[in-house]
Amino acid sequence: MSETQSDPIDVSKFKNGDDVHFDYNSTTNDQTINSTNVQKKKKKKKSKNKHKGSPNVEATLNDPDVEYPTSRVIKQAPNGDVIIESLDEPSDAHTKSVTANIWDNATLEEQENLKAFWESLDEAQKIELVKIDKKSIMDIFKNESKTVNTSNNHQNNSNTQGGSTSTSGGALNGSSTNVNIPGAPSNSSNGACTCSYCGRKNNFIEDELENIYDNHFDDIIDFIHEVRDINDLNALPGLLFGGFHMLEEEHKLQKRQQKYKYKQERDAHHDHHNHEPGHICSDTGSSGDYDGSTQQDQQHQYEHEIEHAFQEDEHEDECGHKNDHSHSHSHSHTENHNHSHSYDPNHNHSHSHFQYDQIEELNNEDELSQEAVLQKSLDDELNKELGDESNNNQSSIATKEQRVFHKLLDPKLFEALENLDFEKMKDTPANNHSAHILEKAGSLRDIIRDLHKADKVELEKGMAFLQNMGKIFSSDMSNAMNHDTLNDQISNGLSSFAEDLLKNDGNSFIDMMESLSESRTAREDLLKEKFDKEPSAAWIDEDDHTKSDTDISIPKPDLHQVQELEEELNDEYDEVDEDDDEGEEEGEEEEEELDDEEFEEDEEEDASDTESEISEEEKMQEIRRLFLIQVIKLFQERLKNAYKEKLSQDRTRTLIEELEAEENAKKEREMKKLRQKEKAKEKKRLQQLAKEEERRKKEEEQKAKEEELKQKQEALRAEQRRKKEEAKQKREEEKRKRIEELKRKELEHQKRLEAQRKKEEETKKLKDEKKKKIEEERKQKEEEKRQKELQKKLVEEERSKSAKKQDHKETGSSEDISQLSRDLENARLGQNFNIPSPVVPDTLLAQPQEPRVKSPTKNHILDQLYLAKPRSLSNSTNSTPQINNVTPGYIPDLSSNSMLPSVLSPSGHNILPNNGNVNNQAVPSPWSSQAFNANTQAPPVYQPQLSSNAFSPFNSSLSQNSLSSNANENLNTNPLNTTGFNEPFATAAQPSSVWNPGATSRNNSIWSNSPNVASNSTLWGNSVPAPPVGAAVGGNPNSLDSDLIQAAAYQAFQFLQNSNQLEFGVAPSLKLFQTAKTILSNQGLTLNQFLTSCRNTGSLSGYGFDFIYDDFGTVTHIKASSTNIPQQPPHNNVNTQSINSLGLGNAAVNDNESSLLNTLSDINNNPNSFSNGVRGLWN
């Protein structure tokens, strides 16, 4: 027996799986040592000896639905299986057999599940499960035999004391016989034996089973159908779960019947319950301790417990019957019902209180305790009836026996015997003896089970059996017998094959078949030898009430025989008590040996031919039961396999569903991650869109701002254009006013011309007078000529240069005009020296009259004035009427006049080689569509024009005739910067008028004078006396600086042009400025001074500059050009005459001076006529 059964484990040592206890037997320790030794070997031997320890055991789970315990103890069963027990509850000392069937250990819930599974099957599947065939049944027998032999082998190996091995078989007639097989090996029951004897024995058993199956198949099937109709598929689960016992419905039906009968009997014999209990309480040495009243109270207590059990059964059966047992009694004793007496082991006080308390303490379950109470109560009732049967009259025997049968038929007795756990009772040494007694009475289960089928004849046989029992245990004999002996006799008499079948699942029958085949002859001889002997004092087996005749009477044994039987039983039970500690299996073997001995004794005393027939009948009954058990096991195995297959399929399906669910969850997580990623991408995209939208809004705002700024600029430019338009309109309005003013002046001029013509007519008369004075004037001019020699030498070189380019085909009128001018100057000089001027020739006086004949009747200048447009000022053109040189004496205050520009040369001589005159041959009139080129130097007021492009506001044609000047060398030329008025003192050689488009010279203006100087027909009125020789006229001190800057600017422009730095023929203003400043080596020169000097048209450098402006009026580019023109050589053949000979008096000079000043005043009053100096009148 293993150590796990003898040494219980203290559960309090282990908490929540903190420690795991491994419990091994001796064989396991040896295996551990062997495995340790194997590890110490070399590596090449490890693979060979690696699996020498324990063989591979297939893992099976008795209850796969139970959760694996966290707090557990791992054990090893005797057969090597691993047992895992939970520590939540105290572990039972008894280890469950691993070979136990799943149906025996199944809970109610599992059985319900199996029933539900059976009901869920269709009819074809049910028929397939309950199909009976020979091969399946024989396979179950073989497998069972192998399993039992293997289990016995392990038990024998684990047994340390090692008792002698014997072959025990179930005895016929309910007794056992110890048959020692001569020559048989000690391990004949060991399935591991491979000897020829054991093989022949196994083959013999199988052959005998096959013969029994073939010969008695119909009888077996009929018996199976008697127990349960296996064709009733709906009722089969009850057969499978309940074995061949009665089903729950049959139990309930019989319970209700028996309870009703029991209640009637109890009411009828209520007075009998108050008597002294009939059970024998023969306490050695203390037989008088319990009086009648105490025993009566105990009996009442037993009856109350039985009634309580019946009431519970009635409640379960849903019957409305209630216990109307209304007798009242009170227990006055204070004795504890759970008390335990310290009796001697041989002195067992077995009254019902004591046994009930022991059973309750062992089982700790209400149901099991109640069943134990019922068992003991019914035993007491049986003993009581047996005692009463010997004391009462013979007339009441039938009634008493009837009550005993009712007690035996009580279903509570059956249930109590069915549910008693003798193994648990054996584990406790104090209850071990009582457990053996109750276990020997286990055959009552079969008796009670078969009583409901008994007919009248069998009931009569049972009555005879009870009578014989009453004779054996008579009152005379029971007083001398102790209580233990009586219990032993009862327990030995109630042993049967059903006990072996129920306890060992038919294993005892297999052993019986082995002994039966070997000892049949020996037993027959033994029966024949003892047949003639006198039968000993023995009783008939409990099955005799169903098989024996009513005439069989058992003689009453004498006291000597009873004492001998008592001694033998006491000796046997002493041996049993000593062997209880060796384990369950050894105790069973001792019991079987005891049964065999008793069987031999019974056979020696009671052997007869009738017993042989009875034994054969009982053997067939056991065979039927054995095959019924095997059939039920077959059905159970099939149903178990089908249920396991269904569970496997369900679990596989559940696993697949869980895997699919896990896969779906995984996919769902992946999809969730993908959705999160998509969401993140969408969020990022939305953020990018938001940023893009914000950027677009900023761009739109920026564009809006730019558009707004552009609109503002556009509005500003529109405003500027509007202002320009207004200024243009204002200029046009001013131009219109000037045109009107010019018309008015033209009318006045016409009036003056008319007056002048009248004066000319008068002057004709005077010329005749002056002819006489010509000679005198010539002389005077010669003298002046000598005085001017020095002055002429200074300008001779310049005149020689200009003379080369001068056209020698000048007309005679131009020479006369030059001569006239020299005569006028001589006359002026003569007047200064008080020299009489000669008379002007008549030819000169007659010339101015020709243009008047050609004058048209209509003035065309008005149309040109209306069509003329304002042009930008050009520094290379002169758009204003030129003012010819006049004598400083005519304008004595000209240098200090604020109306004159500040560009008059301070030097006392002419800078240009043409003596201050500029010949600009390519300048159109101010009313043409060409740009105006400004002369860098205007001719002196007192000097006639030499160029052929002299300005004439009434003539757009150009004349190739130039005027030659014979100015005095001792006079300073005072040019005007911007004004270009023609010489008002025109000589007779140039008599062209305003309406003469074919004139040879353009120097006639609207103020053009007549050739007759003496007529004083000029714009400025009469002439004034000439200043003395050498008198200086005020000039501009900055004229030389402007000339230097213009010359440097022109050189810089030429440098940029040669180095290909020009842009479309023009130079950038800043680059030109930097280059000019480098040339001048003047770092203090500013851009404003540079531009002002370049705009200075009164400079004598002879260079012109064109400017290009941007939209804001800033100079961006400048173009430079040269305007130097050679001067005309002087004509010295003009006679020097006195001013007086020309008939010019002071009045005439004063009138001319007044007219010139008025004209300059008009020009100065116009604010738009000047830009960076004095601008032209129509610019």
Curated annotation (Swiss-Prot):
What does the UniProt record say this protein does?
May act as a negative regulator of salt tolerance.
To which protein family does this belong? Answer: Belongs to the NST1 family.
The encoding gene is NST1
Which InterPro entries does the record cross-reference, listed alphabetically?
A: Fungal_stress_NST1, NST1
UniProt lists compositionally biased (Basic and acidic residues) regions at 10-22, 262-278, 300-347, 663-681, 690-812
Coiled-coil stretches: 648-810
Q: Where is this region: Disordered?
A: 1-64, 147-189, 255-351, 537-619, 660-819, 928-947, 957-997
Tell me which domain of life the UniProt entry assigns to the organism this sequence originates from.
Eukaryota
The entry's cellular-component GO terms read: cytoplasm
Coiled coil recorded as keyword = yes
Compositional bias of type Basic residues: which residue ranges? 39-53
Q: What residue spans carry the Polar residues bias annotation?
A: 24-38
Where it sits in the cell: the answer is: Cytoplasm
Q: What is this protein called?
A: Stress response protein NST1
Q: Where is the composition biased (Low complexity)?
A: 149-178, 282-299, 957-977
**Record bears the keyword Coiled coil:** yes
List UniProt keywords, sorted A-Z.
Answer: Coiled coil, Cytoplasm, Stress response
Q: Where is the composition biased (Acidic residues)?
A: 564-616
